[in-house]
Amino acid sequence: MKVLVLGNGGREHALVWKLRQSPRVAKLYCAPGNGGIADEAECLPVDLKNLDSIVAVGAQVRPDLTVVGPELPLTLGVVDEFTRRGWPAFGPTKAAAQLEASKSFAKEFLQRHRIPTAPYAICESVEEVRAALAHFHAPVVVKADGLAAGKGVVIAVSKEEAAGVAAEMFSGKMVGEAGWRVVLEECLKGDELSFLVLSDGERVAPLVAAQDHKRVGDGDTGPNTGGMGAYSTQSIIDDKMRDWLVHHIACPVVEGMKAEGAEFKGVLYCGLMMTARGPMVLEFNCRFGDPETQPILMRLESDLVDALEASIAGRVSEGDFKWSRDASVCVVMASGGYPGTYEVGKKIAGLNEAGAVDGVKVFHAGTSKRDGSFYTAGGRVLGVSARAPDLQAAVERAYRACEKIRFDGAHYRKDIAARAMKK
C-alpha cells in the first residue's frame, strides 16, 4: 500500500519511522518532510497552509492511507477533502478539529459535558479581561483562542501582567490572528500528563501515557515552547487511573462530539493537570503530540498501520496495540534563541555517532540536507530519543547521544524526566 504522511517535524519523522516498519507499506511519502525524513521516505513539496496544494499532492500520490501530522491541515479540512475523493485519511474532520482550533470552543464543550477543567473566562477586549480578572487570583493563565504553535499560553504572575499579555494578543503582535479572543484560566497546580487515545467516533483505545516538558529551561523555567522533551514509562499512571481517564474524560469527549454532530475520529490528545482535586483538562490536541509521539512510538511493538485503519473503519479496540514494558525518552535539541528569534543554516555534526548509541534513534525536526550534510532549519532541530529497560538507562542513553551532536547555538534541557526518577 501507498502511505502519505503530512508534516515536516520530529513527530512526522517518528511516524514515518514506525510506518516504515510495517510489512504492509510498499511506498512511503512525506510532504514536505525534512532532511532526515528524506532518508526514509520520498519527500514531496507542499504548502501545508494551502488546502489546494495538499490536495494536489494527494492527486499525485493517490494514497491508500494518509496520516496528518500537524494541526493546521486538519483545521483546513484535509480529512474531509481526502475522504470525499476516496483517499482514506486518518484524523478528525474540520468540524471535530475545533476542539484544538478554538480554546473557547473546547472550554465551553467541557462545561456542557461536565468534564473537569479549570474555571475560566472568555474575553474579546482588554475591558472584558480587566472585568473578568476580578474573579481570579494570581497567577492567571492567558491563552490565545486560536492555533499558535504551542506558544499561545502565558502564565501571568500578576493580574496586571495578565491584562498586558491579553492586550498583546489582541493587537496581533504576539500570535497573529490566533489572539483575537483570549481565554483566562485559573492556574492549576500538579503534574502535567499527556493522555492520548485512538478513536473511531464511538470507541476509544488508550495509548501509553507520556509526560511533556513545555518550558524552555531546566527546572521548568522560561517561556513555553512546542515541547523540549518527553518520556513514557509504564509507571506514569496505573491501570485504575488509566481506566478513570478513559471513562471520565476521553469517552465523554467522543460521545459529546458525536451528539453535537461532529464525530471524532483520529487521535485525541488530552493535556491534563493531575491536581489534588483530580485530573483536569488543560487542552485538547486533535493529532499526535510533538515530542510525545517520539517516546510513545518507540514503545509500540504492533503494526501502526492496522491501528490507524481501525480508526478510519470504525473498529477500534484496545487489542490494536502491543506495547513494550521498556521506558523511552526524547530530548529536544533546539536552535540558539528558541523559542524567540533564532538563526538557521548551522551545520550539524555527530549524528552518526549519536545514532550509534545503543537504543537511540535521532528524529529530525527542523533540518535540511544538502551535499550530504545536515543543517538547522527550524527552532526545534532534533529529537534525540532512546529506549531502555528502565527510565534512568533511557535518559542516560539519550544524553550520551546529545553530547555527540554539535551545531552552533545548540541548547537542550538537562533535566528531562528528572522529577520522575526522583519519585
Residue locations for each model-derived region?
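Short acidic-hydrophobic, aromatic-tinged amphipathic segments that line or gate anion-handling sites
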Residues: 43-49, 121-125, 156
